A protein has these predicted regions:
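Extreme N-terminal leader/targeting segments of oxidoreductases
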Residues: 1-18, 36-37, 471-475, 523-547
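N-terminal glycine-rich phosphate/pyrophosphate-binding loop and immediately adjacent elements
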Residues: 6-146, 468-470
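A conserved FAD-binding loop/helix module that cradles the flavin
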Residues: 68, 494-515
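Rossmann-like flavin
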Residues: 109-212
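Mid-domain catalytic core of redox enzymes
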Residues: 230, 260-385
Length: 547
């Protein structure tokens, strides 16, 4: 596919038309349509595998995916599904649908609530559990829908009349611009347990509900209204499918290729210098790295405006995590597990729990007060190894808790660092065993990642999970724009308009759209097969497939 609008790019002589720094969901979703439009595109990835947070890795034969646990918006007609099919990546990408009766299980103390697929089903179940809050539950969910649908309408505005119509519909939503997720919940319901349940997915943005933007909170709830999905083959299946489409269109990917500097001519980005000292020229650069890496390291503060320097100095990055990757010799389905995710909380004050997660409390030999657990071999039943289940558990921690070891080389850190990791892993397993007796004694393999692991492999500032923190002042008008103040330099990824696989993918499309000077729909015409969705919970289905 060659867009006529790409002709304006081809009259300058450079090594590449576009160089993309980083192969995360944002970088690759920009790379594919640009290459399909006939541009000469290079993606530089510092890691040995593509994907950024969407990559997978193997340890002792067990496959893990640190950043992809479930994805929404893959129902028929969903935007992300349309992207995968429109770019042709659906030819090499399949998903498994998580338990439609509970893609997220929220466990608070001794109480449990399962989030079912479908907004109406969710409202009905919540009202059944909390009949005294029935009216507030309905109003809350309707407000969540209105907030997201009006945001989507604003993106589609094509006329003054359309703008006025959207503004009139969304006038009542302006009140939420500077409000938090907690404000949104508390406006409609008062039951402490219900408030905790509605805050139960806060790990998808990593902030206390009182700190996160109401629109980010609402967006996560809305994103999963039509269920949760997991890529067959693990998170790495997503970048692998994008890379195949990218190379098919003539794009070039260089792994283990770190960019050391973005080259400027006055205030225009003209190329990159790689870590080996070689230089490449280009007409455009798209950075999938976070703002500190892009501006602070690759460009340098001295080359930035005072306004941008001040902004970098004030930035808050999202929380980091302790990531426990482990395998168990235990029949987890017989023990009551299914393909849904498990959010474990000691009590219903979710705000207090997430505030603790911003600190170093867990280093003081504490049992985590919150955990996220997922069993990837129940999400994707085709990936069992030796009859063992692979599991991933996460709890939040502030980066400063591990700062003292940051100067030590990865893989060669001191004995006290490894000893601390072992202690934390044991405490996480103790916490899981309290909820699920027997799981701790069934562990046959375990490995713990820390914020320093994230910093090394993902190049994430402060080991952040979601780029910049999605506070009220750092989203919307406060987010980093796709087009930077440096001419020819574009941004994508979690620190721009949105995070997560779907959010980052959207930002990559916006970057490509800006360069091609077209509409997003113009870039989604390659046409792949209809996305294949497998039912994770249908055991007879997997038996027939011989898996």
């Amino acid at each position: 596919m060659l867009l006529s609008s790409s002709s304006h790019i081809k009259n300058l002589q450079t090594d590449y038309d576009v160089i993309i720094i980083g192969s995360g969901a944002g970088g690759l979703s920009a790379a594919v349509p640009l290459a399909q439009a006939g541009l000469k595109v290079l993606v530089c990835e510092q890691h040995e595998v593509p994907g950024g947070w969407t990559h997978s890795f193997a340890l002792q034969g067990y496959r893990f995916s640190p950043g992809v646990h479930y994805i929404g918006d893959l129902h028929e007609g969903g935007f992300l599904r349309n992207v995968y099919e429109g770019l042709g990546v659906s030819d090499d990408l399949e998903f498994c649908e998580l338990n439609p009766d509970g893609y997220d299980h929220i466990l608070i103390g001794q109480d449990r609530f399962d989030f079912p697929k479908g907004k109406a089903n969710l409202v009905s179940r919540l009202q059944k559990h909390f009949p005294h809050e029935a009216q507030g539950i309905a109003a809350y969910m309707d407000t969540v829908s209105s907030m997201m649908e009006n945001l989507d309408s604003m993106r589609r505005i094509k006329s003054i009349g359309g703008a006025l119509n959207t503004i009139s519909k969304g006038a009542g939503l302006v009140r939420w611009t500077w409000r938090s997720g907690k404000d949104l919940i508390d406006r409609f319901v008062s039951d402490p347990l219900l408030r905790g349940i509605l805050s139960g997915q806060s790990g998808d943005h990593g902030l206390p509900p009182s700190m996160v933007s109401s629109f980010v909170h609402a967006g996560i709830t809305y994103h999963y209204f039509n269920g949760g999905y997991y890529p067959r083959g693990g998170g790495g299946a997503i970048p692998n499918a994008f890379v195949r489409a990218f190379k098919k269109a003539g794009g070039k990917l260089r792994l283990k290729t770190a960019v050391a500097h973005i080259l400027l001519n006055r205030n225009k980005a003209v190329g990159v210098e790689l870590a080996d000292g070689s230089k490449l020229t280009t007409k455009y650069i798209i950075s999938n790295a976070d703002p500190e890496v892009t501006f602070g390291q690759l460009i340098g503060r001295n080359n930035l405006s005072k306004k941008l320097r001040r902004r970098l100095d004030r930035l808050q990055y999202s929380v980091s995590a302790l990531s426990l990757f482990f395998a168990v010799d235990m029949d987890l389905r017989a023990a009551g597990f299914d393909s849904g995710n498990y959010w474990l909380y000691d009590h219903a004050d979710i705000d207090k729990i997430y505030r603790l997660g911003l600190t170093d409390y867990i280093l003081k030999n504490k049992i985590p007060s919150a955990l996220f657990l997922t069993v990837t071999t129940l999400k994707d039943p085709g990936k069992m190894r030796k009859g063992h289940h692979t599991c991933e558990a996460f709890t939040f921690v502030g980066y400063n808790a591990f700062r003292k070891w940051a100067h030590e080389k990865s893989g060669e850190r001191s004995a006290d660092y490894q000893s601390l990791k072992d202690k934390i892993a044991e405490n996480m397993l103790k916490a899981l065993n309290k909820r699920f007796p027997g799981i701790r004694d069934s562990v046959v393999f375990k490995n713990l990642g820390t914020p320093l692991t994230n910093e090394h492999y993902i190049k994430a500032t402060r080991g952040s999970l979601y780029g910049i923190a999605k506070t009220r002042r750092q989203v919307g008008p406060g987010a980093f724009p796709i087009r930077s103040e440096i001419e020819g330099l574009y941004l994508c990824g979690a620190s721009t308009l949105s995070h997560g696989v779907a959010g980052a993918t959207f930002t990559g499309l916006l970057a490509a759209k800006s360069i091609l000077q077209c509409r997003i729909s113009d870039m989604l015409k390659t046409g792949g097969r209809s996305l294949v969705i497998h039912p994770a919970e249908d055991l007879s289905y997997w038996q027939k497939k011989g898996k």
